[in-house]
Amino acid sequence: MIDLKDLGTFESVPEIVIDIVKGNILALESALADGWDIHKPIQLGKYSEYSPLELALVMNCLPSVQWLVEHGADLNDEENPSFLLAVRYADQKVIDYVVDHGANIHALNSVEVDAFQAALYGKKYENLQIIHDLGHTVQKYGGKAFRNAITENNYEVLDFFIHNGVDINYNKPDSVYPFKPTPLCVAARYVDLQMCKYLVEHGADVTITEKDGMRPYSIAIERCDMEMAEYFKTLEPTEYHDKQNKMDQLKPFKLPKALVSFLEEDNLYFELPDSDFISIEFLPLLDTVPFKLGRRKLLRLSKELGEYNDWQIVWDPKSKKIGCYDTEHQELRELCKFDE
């Protein structure tokens, strides 16, 4: 069996692949003389193919990398730029070589991954400082990778980003986090209180909301993590938890008095045995979450909706009705008036 790292393990591969990963330059010269095209991808298994340069970089074989570059291999392939492969799989000698010969340090691959993310995927943490020192700086480019690293619980990696000036409140949308969370929101939703405290100690803002209005405190309430919720509550402005201030905030929503009274009751959890939802739990009035769907204002009323994690019960002031909001597809369905 032939192990090519995370490209896979193969019972057999073309002989040229062995020559590439072992740096057999004489064999590569001979193959070139016999008409081998160094730009043509090599088939591995039924469904995968890789360029010779990709194979050399993945296997950290500097002699083959050098030989291929000298013979015209493309260092800045749009789908798999050499710099990303080097920082994910290789050592500093290979990284320095491809950069010295024209590799774009700011390149993104076909799925918008940058160098910091590539190094994290490959667990080549020692390459993070190299990337930064080459000019792909943490301050300008590190936010996305930093946010992605939160769920790995690797504090040494997080320290690297923070000490090099990462935007600790980075919240641009991407394919992983389209709902625009900050790293602190990610920590509140997917990690633990220790991580939240770590981020706050390094300047994370507890008041920044996600696209749907959720802030770290709201996320903790949703998760029923009252220790975390109390922690965030002590850090938030006092007016966030003042009833009169909340009522002023909710005036544009024109809530029916009956709905206000309902949300102030003690029991906000209901079993729904004859419904697909199974159960529903509403948020207390002070914890309801205003947000916008496009230009339309909505107020989230539900804490959880049975097994439907992507659905929320909302109040729509435009229709003056209760609605159901599908967060995954960003669709709003009108249900009924509150008293119905």
Short names for language-model regions:
Residues G8-I18, P41-E54, N76-L85, L108-Q117, ...:
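Ankyrin-repeat boundary/"N-cap" motif
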Residues F146-H241:
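Elongated, non-catalytic scaffold/linker segments and compositionally distinctive motifs
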Residues E11-S12, K211-V314:
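A surface-exposed partner-binding patch
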Residues A56-K124:
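A generic tandem-repeat structural signature
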Residues V98-V166, D174:
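Solenoidal tandem-repeat scaffolds enriched in leucines and small polar residues
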Residues G35-H39, G72-D74, G102-H106, G135-V138, ...:
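The conserved C-terminal loop/turn that links adjacent ankyrin repeats
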Residues N24-A33, N60-E70, A90-D100, K123-D133, ...:
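Ankyrin repeat structural motif
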Residues I18-N24, E54-C61, L85-D91, Q117-K124, ...:
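Ankyrin repeat A-helix N-terminal signature
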